[in-house]
Amino acid sequence: SGILQQRHFEMIETDGATLRVVVEGEGPLVILLHGWPQCWYLWRHQIDPLVAAGYRVAVPDQRGYGGSSCPPEVSDYDIRKLTADVDAIRAALGYDTFQLIGHDWGCLVAWNTALLYEHTCTAVMGLSVPFWRISEAAVNPPGLDDRFWYIRYFQQPDVVERELDRDIERSLRTNFYGLGSDSPPGTWMTQLEHPASVGLLDALPAPGELGAWTTKEDLAYYVEQFSRHGFRGPTNWYRNLPSINALTPELEGKLISQPAAFAAGADDDVLLYDPDWRAPFEAGFRDLRFLEILDGAAHWLQVEKPAETTALMLRFLSEVA
């Protein structure tokens, strides 16, 4: 239903990019940020319920993705530019403030937007990726040695794009399956059993069937979106991970003061990256409304458990209204 239903897209100019943004509904502004490798379509089950609940919903393809522009330089995707894009959507739509919900890489952008734009971003919710001040350990975890780790692999220029652009459908299915609820929990982490010399598609298991959460039509739409620019723009996001701290020294030790919430699937392998992931929420968020773990979901909770995820989003938005 998500594809066949005609969405209202607007093209929004930001500093250095043109974003294609689904904009629907009337009311307070809520911006939804996808991550890697995704596009606006990740939120296909959430848009209508949020509109029905009385919100204006803006869902961009973030820069480098889908119908948005794909700037050429690695530095075009640094954290300052990614967060500025979000506030530029607010300004273009004529709002003073907005509420923000991110998923995966969209969480890193959301947490940092909340810190850098605290006067316009009034509430922030993350799905899947906890609040982390990214350090070199994200790229080179201690003890990694010569084992494969996707974030380190993604730092290599051209190699990654060549591998993933060769067969876009296979690349997407491998990622969706490896992090999804159809593969056993921990599947994503099996990449660490492979040597650093292989590519991502060799380090992850061949994808099995995807459940009803990603139909053949869904997959075809994703392939169409990624065929526009390939994986260069999306992978450039990862090439900016090492620079986040240097570009935001004023955020060192700063935690989120706005109302905030976090939810993740119980089987999301991202939570295995850091057994201590709850600590920043418990230690430093000034107004954490809730932290929920959804059974039966892995990484793609918006589509694996759409009704439950939407309910958590609406619960948060209604609490902070």
Give the role of each language-model region:
Residues F9-M11, V57-V59, F290-I293:
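Conserved beta-strand scaffold positions in the cores of enzyme catalytic domains, especially
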Residues L288-A321:
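Catalytic active-site module of serine/aspartate enzymes centered on a nucleophile-bearing elbow/loop
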